[in-house]
UniProtKB/Swiss-Prot annotation:
Domain ENT: 57-144
Lineage, highest ranks first: Eukaryota, Viridiplantae, Streptophyta, Embryophyta, Tracheophyta
Stretch list, region Disordered: 1-44, 146-251
A GO cellular component annotation in the UniProt record: nucleus
Organism: Arabidopsis thaliana
Name used for this protein in its record: Protein EMSY-LIKE 4
Role this protein plays: Probably involved in the regulation of chromatin states. Contributes to RPP7-mediated and basal immunity, especially against Hyaloperonospora arabidopsidis isolate Hiks1.
GO terms (BP aspect): defense response to fungus
SUPFAM superfamilies: ENT-like (SSF158639), Tudor/PWWP/MBT (SSF63748)
Composition skew (Low complexity), residue ranges: 166-179
Subcellular location: Nucleus
Sequence motif Nuclear localization signal 1, location on chain: 190-197
SMART domains in the cross-refs: ENT
């Protein structure tokens, strides 16, 4: 049989691409090939590359979260180192939302405390400058302690005595952390001159331009008027050694005391909020977080035992000046800083408040102030409910509860005093 000649060249060049056999005998270098010309199997390095990319993205996201968290910490530190319950609540929620551990929190907090900008702000505060605004001064006061509840019946206001403002000679910057040893309550009103304020004395309203206008009374340098806080930079070197019988002076912060003033021979409640280790003085705040708030810097050891009453345990501080009395140890200096609230009188919430010790027999009004218990309970529950509670928050919660206990004991004692006084009056009648 005759064989017809084939037009084919005898190779697979005439076959379709999908039927061609790769040269080199067997499979090609890239492995098996699909009909579309792509390899059926990806190289083993491809999944690893995708995992590395995902891990890198996660790291970048967490870095952004840490930057956001440290920015909030820096902002709070710039406002003031006394952290309120509200700010701590914000910080706790941020740590949850941004997935930050306690170790990362401590690391970032350490970076904030060592930040050059924050350090300059602290030095500015310590150097004796004023707060940038009234809002910041109010924030520091509220951060120290929650606002106490005050009986509305005691808020009887007296007419204020207008006093012309005097320009402040110079201003210097200020700030600091935690318990600011300088004066944290100074506000924009600190640019004014001295504002004399006398407790327990009634004043007639004096109008500007009146011929009967009296000049501000002169007060000797060793006894400035009630309700004023003198300049943090005294004109003479102040001794920083205050005998506290081996007790840490900062342990008095948050304690409540009652001090007697010679103007009306009456005791007034105050809270110890700050300590200045340079001068050895503590800040006493009266009517805290109210329009009539006043404060002063004193050396507790120099107050006569008969002029101070401790609510709770008495630390037994010695009196170096043999009972010379309250008012001899206040900070002196050429420039006065009026209290927050544009110089309202200290006795605006205590009009008519008298004790039976001067023999007048007038009724003594009850003045009890304690923290809002429901707010306090909520904050303590928030600390206890957290998964890993911060030891600092737990310690602070314990301290606040102890202070609240002291306040309740003092309130019960006041109720007992009032009840005894009323019973004695009824017996005399």
């Amino acid at each position: 049989m005759d064989c017809k000649s084939s037009d084919s060249s005898g190779t697979d060049d005439d076959l379709p691409p999908s039927h061609r056999v790769p040269r080199g005998g067997g499979g090609g270098r890239g492995g098996r090939v699909a009909g579309n010309g792509r390899p059926l199997n990806l190289p083993p390095s491809y999944p690893k590359m995708y995992d590395d990319l995902a891990a890198d993205m996660e790291a970048q996201i967490h870095q952004i979260e840490k930057e956001a968290y440290i920015s909030v910490l820096r902002a709070f530190k710039a406002q003031g180192d006394a952290i309120s319950w509200e700010k701590e609540s914000v910080i706790t929620e941020l740590r949850k939302e941004l997935s930050l551990s306690n170790e990362e929190h401590r690391e970032l907090l350490g970076r904030v405390n060592s930040d050059d900008t924050i350090r300059r702000i602290r030095e500015w505060r310590q150097s004796g400058g004023m707060q940038p605004s009234m809002r910041n001064a109010a924030q520091v006061v509220h951060d120290t302690l929650p606002s106490p509840s005050v009986s509305a019946s005691m808020k009887t206001h007296k007419p204020n005595q207008p006093i012309p403002s005097q320009p402040f000679a110079s201003s210097s910057p200020s700030f600091h952390p935690q318990a600011d040893p300088t004066h944290p309550f100074a506000s924009s009103t600190a640019k004014r001159g001295p504002v004399p304020i006398v407790k327990g004395k009634k004043h007639k309203p004096v109008f500007p331009g009146s011929s009967s206008t009296k000049h501000a009374p002169y007060h000797p340098s060793d006894q400035p008027p009630r309700g004023q806080v003198m300049n943090r930079l005294p004109s003479v070197p102040a001794s920083s050694s205050e005998p506290t019988n081996g007790i840490d002076p900062e342990s008095f912060l948050g304690r409540r005391v009652r001090t007697k003033w010679p103007e009306d021979n009456t005791f007034y409640d105050a809270i110890i909020t700050q300590y200045n280790p340079v001068e050895g003085r503590h800040a006493l705040v009266y009517d805290i977080a109210t329009p009539s708030e006043t404060w002063e810097w004193v050396r507790l050891s120099e107050i006569s035992p008969g002029d101070i009453e401790w609510i709770g345990e008495d630390p037994g501080l010695g009196n170096r000046y043999n009972g010379q009395g309250h008012g001899l140890n206040r900070t002196t200096g050429p420039n006065c800083v009026p209290q927050r609230g544009s110089g309202l009188e200290k006795n605006t919430i205590r009009k008519g408040f008298r004790t039976s010790q001067n023999g007048t027999g007038k009724k003594k009004h009850l003045d009890i102030r304690i923290r809002q218990t429901d707010v306090l309970i909520r904050e303590v529950e928030r600390v206890l409910r957290s998964h890993n509670p911060d030891p600092y928050e737990v310690e602070r919660a314990k301290r606040v509860l102890e202070e609240h206990e002291h306040a309740l004991v003092g309130a019960i004692a006041k109720l007992g005093d009032i009840s005894d006084g009323e019973n004695e009056g009824a017996f005399r009648r």
